[in-house]
Amino acid sequence: FLNNFHDIFTTIGVVILFAGLSLGGAQFHESLRLEAGSLSSHAAAITLLALIGLMAWGLSALLVGRQRRILPGIVLCCVFVVFASLALSWIYIRLIMAQFDSAAFDAAVDSITSTSALSREAFDAMLADLPWTIRLMPIVFGGSALVVSAFYYSSFRLPFAGGLTGLALVSFAMLAWLVIDPYTVVRFNPLINLLMGLALFLGGIAFDARDPARTTRLSGTGFWLHFFAAPMLLSAAVTLAITGAQADGESPLGTGPVFMPMTEDGYALRAAIVSLVVIAVFALISLLINRRALIVSGLLTTGVALAVLVNQLGLDGAGVAAVTLLVLGGIVVLLGVAWTPVRGVLTAPFPSSGVIARIIPPVAHGHEG
């Protein structure tokens, strides 16, 4: 991420610059005093979004394309993808506004909210009330993000942009599925998230296998694919283990394992134990494939699970926080110190060459992921 402290200095400048551009653009649009909802107002907003995106692209050509500065490139990539995809999506929104029937949309929403339980019939009724121009909006939003992120990655080969493109790709697939069969996506959301996470994880493995020594941009892209895959896999695995494949909207855990303290004590304790078991499996996989991203993404959930367990000791809030941080910090430091020796033990039974060695690289390669 860093070549030297100059990268941090430049990144701070980039963040300040685009924060100012965003606020300035909003103020400029307001100063035009255009009629709200008019074509000229929409055109001005789209133009301002596109201009900020183009500025991010221009700086990327200098900082990423020529100077290969990774950390500023991550910020610029995010700015470009957000503003460019918003501009593209806004164009579609403006085109369909003339066909938008608010009464039909309200009726479609009411057909879902008026039912006490999710059913395929309710979703079918909702779809029947919505025109295709509205139903396709998720695909347009997801497709815009995918096209923009893929364009950035193909232009600058920034590893972060590659990971973001992978995330946009699986998100686009999920949104397309949502348009075709919303009931299945909503009802079986934990299973869908697991499939998305597995797709990103396998993509990361594919990039890693092409660079087992972890020395090129390929492994950098693999890192970010693992980084984006890990939260999906962890949340989906914990939710599946506790609530099953179907989404449970009434349980706070249905939103994610980090909300386990909001559940009943017995349920929270069970969720904490399951979470730690899943995280332990993730840690084992991380050691085998030499990727810390799977562990890093689970630190928050690990901390929450440990806090739930420590809370059983009857300590006050400060005591729970102190013990949790001590245990969590100790685990991270221990993994950092013993990473290579433990990997040496775990990878010893595996071959040191061939296809398996590209997926589970031996310690002899020396580089850490």
Locate the predicted segments by residue:
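Alpha-helical multi-pass membrane segments and their bilayer interfacial helix-loop junctions
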Residues: F1-G369
